[in-house]
Amino acid sequence: MWRDSRRSHDWIAPVTERAAIVTGASSGIGLAVARMLAEEGHAVTLVARRPDKLQTAYEALLADGLEVQRVPADVGKEDDVVGAVAAHRDAYGRLDVLVNNAGVGIGAPIGELSTKRMDIQLNTNLRSIPLFYREALPMLAAAGAEHRRALVVNTASIAGKSGQPWLSIYSATKFGVVGFTQAMNKELSAQGIRSTALCPGFVDTAMADFAKEHTPGEKMIQTADIVVAVRMLLSLGPNCLVPEIVFERPAAG
């Protein structure tokens, strides 16, 4: 994974071949995508809010011989985002793939939704994404200049394509993710930085536990399906970008 590519007299500094940041990386989609990236040769910075769950994920990947580091961070807080990107830069020096996956959904009628619960969703699901772009842009731009295939994957939702009752703020944040992703392609794709919004329906993760009374987990979209999609994005040539991918369940037969 490491190569000696920068030389100063007799001193050699290690530089990673490819590197990635994944948020919401302690479980579910984030952990599955982080594992795939690490298995395919990326040095991966795992970012998640809960240190205990993050440690468990980190140890599991490390035990499999994968190059990872963990950074506990609440992506809804600007200082945590700045710190996470700085920690990645200090460890790996480059960024080829950024996966903005952290998210939270709080269901409630709009008349009963507190401002605090609105802000948690707005800050975590939406505001964090432009913050990561801003802080990571120098590294992403360097990767784009090098190989024209820097990639940012933003986890949105099917709720970002069709507003959902009792998930109004969640839906609004995911619509925002889709729109922001479109804007970033228009702004940054000429620099070799491509962005894709993932818009899945229910995925079989803990976040969808509330729906499993009516839709069993085995009938939901699987994290492996998301991994396949991200792997496909990584395989595309520099003259192709995919603005969004919508994942739906088959109609009930």
Describe the function of each predicted region.
Residues 26-27:
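Conserved glycine-rich cofactor-binding loop
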Residues 40-56:
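Conserved glycine-rich Rossmann-like NAD(P)H-binding loop of the short-chain dehydrogenase/reductase
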Residues 51-52, 72-83, 115:
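The beta1-alpha1 cofactor-binding region of Rossmann-like NAD(H)/NADP(H)-dependent oxidoreductases
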Residues 109-110, 114-122:
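Substrate-binding pocket helix/loop in short-chain dehydrogenase/reductase
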Residues 133, 173:
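Active-site helix of classical SDR
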Residues 157:
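Residue(s) in the substrate-gating loop at a strand-loop-helix junction
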Residues 197-198, 205, 213-253:
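C-terminal helical subdomain
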